[in-house]
């Protein structure tokens, strides 16, 4: 029996540990209070844009370093999983991210291998502020605190850094950044997506007027480069009551080579898109006139291909936009004026275009009616721009899609002529024979 006492005591201890996990042992020393504020350095890290769409915006993190204990950790709020459940949640507008910590040097090597800029700004905080921010970051990594619901413009991996810095500064950062921003969120999106014009147009198409409203500099800091810029300009009140720069020093760990810089202003694609839209619509009219004159297969097949192309390029996004508005929590897609330009009806041009290519007798008339509806909706969307509530900045999409729709409606109306001519010729021949 005496021998069982130590064993029972040990088992009881293990049960207590299981019931109350010892989170303290998982915390960095600045999370437990072991680190002293005067021994800490806090760095805002800005990573430049990358190659894939998700990395076009860049990325940001915070590094906490304890010089006395020779420890450093990088805190990254951009962690997410590519499993099936994540894709489903993202499709429904509920994407869950989390924060994790990692080795700063290993992270820097990784971004260097991707040829992405790595820039550091050491924050000029008081020892008490450094200790507070370090503890905040360390506690956020704990399993019960780490997850958050990602929102691209208002709650992302950079706004979390901004909010943490502002908290330890007593709201000074928010106050200093409360002035008007340089441009709308849509203009920022267009700047950063300039590296991929087709994807830029798709994103432009999917987003409503939420991102066209005036914003503050604080809201612009959803972008890593904007937060970096604003922190560099910031003056904060120090322990002596005097204002000091928030950035004590800048460190460039790596500068990318051969990567295009993000433009300061959004690109002006409107005139180019208008020319493309007019060329597409005019081309459809030209094919219809050719078909009317010759009655050959080539113009019919080419006109069918134009319909198939339009259905693929604009019909699928139009259908997706409608579904996102009606059935998901992607509020940035709601009540989108681009549905006047492309919508689920637009997708019908795909099968009808295929039927036209294969010589269906009913396809031309069905397409004509469809295009009259689509062109009418596009014109209606343009006319409604006169009302204040229709304020979405979709002019470049109007310039591209509306001439196409009007041109196709005209082309399919003209395509009725050959059938009418053939019928009148047949009637004349029968009368002559009689």
Feature locations, PLM:
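Bacterial N-terminal signal peptides
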Residues: 8-19
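Sec/Tat signal peptide C-region and signal peptidase I cleavage site
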Residues: 20-24
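A eukaryotic "domain-start" boundary segment
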Residues: 25-42
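Glycine-rich catalytic cores of cysteine/serine-nucleophile enzymes that process amide/ester linkages
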Residues: 38-116, 333-334
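Second-shell loop/turn segments in exported
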Residues: 50-51, 115-124, 143-152
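A structural motif
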Residues: 125-138
